[in-house]
Amino acid sequence: NQKRLALKEENYPRCIVRECCCMNPYKMVIAVANQKGGCAKTTTAVNLAAALAKGSKKQGLPPSKVLLIDLDPQGNCATSFGVEKKKVKKTAYDLLANESGEDLPLMDEYLIPPKQLTESMQEAWSMRNGGKKAPTNLSVGNLWLLPSDIHLSGAEIELSHKIGRETRLREALAPIIDNFDHIIIDTPPSLGLLSINAMCAANWVMVPVQAEYYALEGFSMLMNSIKMIQRRINRNLKIFGIAMTMVDARSKLSRHVCDQVNSKMPKKLFKTTIRRLVKVAEAPWSGAPTVLLNKPTNSGAGAGSLEYWTLAKEYHHRVLAMRREFGVNEQPRLLLERKNRM
């Protein structure tokens, strides 16, 4: 079975995905991917999704409707919002490995809505702070989550013999893609069938790269894998941006890795870098992403929050520039709503 799951070109016929549900390049379906673990994929996906959904006038970021999809069997996206895994009834595993019939079930049945995410964050914060009332900033009104759990690790084997196994997520997204401004997919630290599903459903890839030596080798391997997926599975897939994470400005090695990535893909590298900060790592324990938990400041507990807010703003500006390039001045969801009112 492991051989069948290996990502080899001969396993996938050319242009297996001829029509993607997100053919339009201005639709933001973005896979946060890197086959190397420990590069802050989940932290980046969670904080980016939360910042885009929350919005901030001070940061110059309007609120957006966001869907966060967790395709990592560790299920840390739910934990980041204080959701107890034992209380989650339906997950990405139930959606992708559904056996009830040929058609996939409606995806919205599997999503945790904003109200439940807000309640989970506030309950988790209160429980870990001696029963105190949670601060009002621990709320998010525009974010939906498709959670995962450890059962998802078996989905690759279960799906390996199924026709269209690479397109399960794409098919599930098709009916709801226009309901959201951004769909962000967190992927596992490997390039198996789950990551392939993410990159088949997406039209963009965002790559967090850890500012350490081994990251350079992993980065080159990932670029080759993305090129193969573009040729064989999803020709609409493009690299949206590369974010340097775990950066230590005092380290010569960190600066060297950042310079090397910049020399390879200068137009794709985000100007914002994410430092290795304890408060960012501690935030999930409090049951909320750092962008919601900590007020953005230049130092102290809010430094990591400021960096992720800045990254979200840079992401937003890239999206606006891309949409202007394609002659689109509004978010796709707003265009659809205007059309429906006419």
Feature map (PLM): residue ranges:
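P-loop NTP-binding core
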Residues: 2-342
